[in-house]
């Protein structure tokens, strides 16, 4: 009897540890469903139907592997990726890495902040500038949760992730994509035009986010007081699998909904979020348009919080400089207000920011692969040969795609 109680207590204790250790991947996963994803996925689905769904599938598989490597670097070493680069790279390289990582973080935050402002505009009928002000206030309130520790923030952001996923289950119900065509688009690679390659790079840049590669390792580096190293890694694998599967589903649903609703109804020119919202109303009804607006708002608010956190990790990790998180939020809001006041087309800014992000992926991945493939550093948590080779393949694909983009832009294709 006492033995069975002991076993039961042990099982409950393990469950508590597993639950306590889950959450960091949900924060990272928010970076994979930000407003930049909305913009690129809607444009890709409206323009090419289901033909680019395979890009989302493979980008999500890549993202899952990358985030697992980032998370286990923090668990195995107690340091994040930026700190390892600072400790092991020459000083000029460290400064270069810091500058490009800050630029990437700013481009990310610009897209996320403007996306949330558009969400407020669509749902509540305010101006874009008023939406930006509301976004600033809302993100301040969410960031203040950090004063209560990491877990409350994980729960709020995880809840917003699940809300966006639920919203897209509803959108799929409204749009009713053709399952056979959808599955074919997921399985058969196709890049029909040069513009499709540009959009594929945007989808890749929107799906694999450099700033959350840095962030995830910092979220797991201080979990040493919660369970053994093997327990932490086991929980992290489950955490990453669940969170990234949800993010992958949302991205697929975004593109499939755009394909079913816009591409096959003669609205393949839908290229911005306002237009998507206004076009959804007559095609699928007010409820579908409202759900779209709310999901954009939830994704924008949560992802801009994550972007602010990532920017702080990058600055502290690379140059040991710390500024209060709320002050950083004020500073990083400025480019968004400049874009809005200048009257630039916000969705175009979103899509171009995602292309810019794709150039930062390889720069984050190369040192991540080097560190997680080092047995002296990682011990028994070193990458397997399969994971290391898959990581190298991701780097090659990203560099090749970026090279094509540079040539295409230079030739104005």
From Swiss-Prot:
GO terms for molecular function: cadmium ion transmembrane transporter activity; manganese ion transmembrane transporter activity; metal ion binding; symporter activity. It is found in: Cell inner membrane. Disulfide bonds: none annotated. InterPro entries: NRAMP_fam. One of its GO terms (cellular component) is plasma membrane. Belongs to the NRAMP family. H(+)-stimulated, divalent metal cation uptake system. HAMAP family: NRAMP. This is Divalent metal cation transporter MntH. It comes from Erwinia tasmaniensis (strain DSM 17950 / CFBP 7177 / CIP 109463 / NCPPB 4357 / Et1/99). The gene is mntH.
């Amino acid at each position: 009897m006492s033995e069975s109680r002991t076993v039961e207590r042990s099982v409950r204790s393990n469950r508590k540890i597993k639950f306590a250790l889950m959450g960091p991947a949900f924060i990272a996963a928010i970076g994979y469903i930000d407003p930049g994803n909305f913009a690129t996925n809607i444009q890709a689905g409206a323009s090419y139907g289901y033909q680019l769904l395979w890009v989302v599938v493979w980008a999500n598989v890549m993202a899952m592997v990358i985030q697992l490597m980032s998370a286990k670097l923090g668990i195995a070493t107690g340091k994040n990726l930026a700190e390892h680069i600072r400790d092991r790279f020459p000083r000029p390289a460290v400064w270069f890495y810091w500058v490009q990582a800050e630029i990437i973080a700013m481009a990310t935050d610009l897209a996320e902040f403007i996306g949330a402002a558009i969400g407020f505009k669509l749902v509540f009928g305010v101006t874009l500038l008023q939406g930006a002000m509301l976004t600033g206030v809302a993100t301040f309130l969410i960031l203040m949760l950090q004063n209560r520790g990491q877990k409350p923030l994980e729960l709020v952001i995880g809840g917003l992730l699940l809300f966006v996923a639920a919203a897209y289950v509803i959108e799929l119900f409204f749009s009713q994509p053709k399952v056979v065509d959808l599955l074919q688009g997921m399985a058969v690679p196709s890049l029909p035009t040069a513009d499709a390659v540009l959009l594929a790079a945007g989808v890749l840049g929107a799906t694999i986010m450099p700033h959350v590669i840095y962030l995830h390792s910092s979220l797991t580096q201080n979990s040493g007081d919660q369970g053994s190293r093997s327990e932490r890694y086991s929980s992290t694998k489950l955490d990453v699998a669940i969170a990234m599967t949800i993010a992958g589903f949302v991205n697929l649903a975004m593109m499939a909904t755009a394909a079913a609703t816009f591409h096959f109804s003669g609205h393949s020119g839908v290229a911005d979020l306002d237009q998507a919202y206004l076009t959804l109303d007559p095609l699928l009804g007010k409820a579908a348009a409202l759900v779209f607006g709310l999901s954009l708002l939830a994704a924008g608010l949560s992802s801009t919080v994550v972007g602010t956190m990532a920017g702080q990790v990058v600055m502290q990790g690379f140059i040991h400089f710390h500024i209060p998180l709320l002050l950083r939020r004020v500073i990083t809001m400025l480019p968004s207000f400049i874009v809005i006041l200048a009257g630039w087309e916000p969705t175009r800014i979103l899509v171009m920011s995602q292309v810019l992000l794709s150039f930062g992926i390889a720069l984050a991945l190369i040192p991540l692969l080097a560190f997680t493939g080092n047995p002296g550093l990682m011990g028994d948590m070193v990458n397997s040969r399969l994971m290391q080779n898959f990581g190298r393949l991701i780097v090659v694909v990203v560099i090749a795609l970026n090279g094509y983009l540079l040539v295409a832009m230079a030739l104005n294709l």
